[in-house]
Amino acid sequence: MTEISILNDVQKIIVLDYGSQYNQLIARRIREFGVLSELKSHKITAQELHEINPIGIVLSGGPNSVYADNAFGIDPEIFELGIPILGICYGMQLITHKLGGKVVPAGQAGNREYGQSTLHLRETSKLFSGTPQEQLVLMSHGDAVTEIPEGFHLVGDSNDCPYAAIENTEKNLYGIQFHPEVRHSVYGNDILKNFAISICGARGDWSMDNFIDMEITKIRETVGDRKVLLGLSGGVDSSVVGVLLQKAIGDQLTCIFVDHGLLRKDEGDQVMGMLGGKFGLNIIRVDASKRFLDLLADVEDPEKKRKIIGNEFVYVFDDEASKLKGVDFLAQGTLYTDIIESGTETAQTIKSHHNVGGLPEDMQFELIEPLNTLFKDEVRALGIALGMPEEIVWRQPFPGPGLAIRVMGAITEEKLETVRESDAILREEIAKAGLDRDVWQYFTVNTGVRSVGVMGDGRTYDYTIAIRAITSIDGMTADFAQLPWDVLKKISTRIVNEVDHVNRIVYDITSKPPATVEWE
């Protein structure tokens, strides 16, 4: 099969974005069934969808009311495409509203529902095949459907929601008031799988090998015979991008590894050894540590740090690219979650991301972001599919701004050194305990807080280091890792004894949400 025929033969389920911070989880769950799923704007037209030729469409949740003046709508012709459609929460209400039903504030029809609720199935449905008649689901709605459109019938309800699941099988239209994409809906994965496989007819044959073929084709068509510049950060994402780009365009790729003085312990030498030596990437190493640290002096605001670093990275690339001939593209390791956290057209910005929000307006390159439709676990799977060794693929995630966002407040060499050394100890002990595959991400943070301590016979007034360790599947949500006490005790003892200017260790037990993974 040729690469072009692979591209044309890929089955897709499109998720239309109506503003939920977690609507991308829908796409992520569907991909788990071996089906490519992508997020598109709710403004997409029926003609544009027809050209994409998806086998299914999902209308996501969102914060608006469908009857409000500023409500996000839908091209009504989409309902006439003959493509199966699943409306989730706002999506179900939108289907109802547009096709002649009625949606009102929940107080006029039952109560608002936020949290787990029991769904009672009243009829059999292909959408709920293999799931129990009563099941826990996550509700999050302030409006409710009171009248369903002609041709629809009730499938399920809850104590506070008269229409929790509806369908029109003749037109292949389905609506559910709850969120199957979150783990709190116990059978949510089964419901989404039923929609993808049983209703949409997905083959379930999407894989990272397909992705590699597609992305290589896209890269070659985009780049042609021109050259690409890639900034290596030392993290998994940029490393995978480097190997993928080299596979696609070979020596048209030049990598710049910028040592901004904000790297982990021995990171520079490790990057050069792994990617420059083993994989033969053409890497230019630039020591710009003084340049970055001078700009960051006395800067405390995390958003300013990110913007400064994002801008300066590109200016460094600009300086280096000016020494090269014919470089037109800048490649980045931006992930789906990076774009999500920076806010989409319909979702509130949580924080700007260094790969999407810190670029200067006068940037001289076109962007290539091969991973911007992938989640972190998919990037690791891609790395394995590309033949990268596990020690690279499972390397701890590291943000582009580096240790700058793991030092609270103003950055100093002393603070940076406390994070470098404590982080190295943490990673070493987690690996020794055999937990490095169980804990999704772990690192240390200099909190900027000093506290009184006693060492030997003397009083100390030194920094407090926080340990952050989380478990997650895709980075969209996360729980703090419940590390064994003996492991935590050993880590704490080593850091206090081996790292200068530190006398207290605390453990971050906050999940995401409400917190983000990084502290800044």
Curated annotation (Swiss-Prot):
GO annotations of cellular component type = cytosol
Q: Give the residues the record marks as binding ATP.
A: S233, G234, G235, V236, D237, S238, S239
**UniProt cross-references to Gene3D superfamilies, sorted A to Z:** 3.30.300.10, 3.40.50.880, HUPs (3.40.50.620)
Please identify the protein, giving its name as recorded: GMP synthase [glutamine-hydrolyzing]
UniProt xrefs under HAMAP family = GMP_synthase
Q: Which UniProt keywords apply?
A: ATP-binding, Glutamine amidotransferase, GMP biosynthesis, Ligase, Nucleotide-binding, Purine biosynthesis
Record-linked InterPro entries: Class_I_gatase-like, GATASE, GMP_synth_C, GMP_synth_GATase, GMP_synthase, GMPS_ATP_PPase_dom, NAD/GMP_synthase, Rossmann-like_a/b/a_fold
Q: Where is the GMPS ATP-PPase domain?
A: 206-395
| Its biological purpose | Catalyzes the synthesis of GMP from XMP.
Enumerate the spans annotated as Glutamine amidotransferase type-1 domain.
Answer: 12-205
Q: Where are the transmembrane segments?
A: none
Return the EC number: 6.3.5.2
The residues responsible for catalysis, as annotated, are C89, H179, E181
Assembly with partners or alone:
Homodimer.
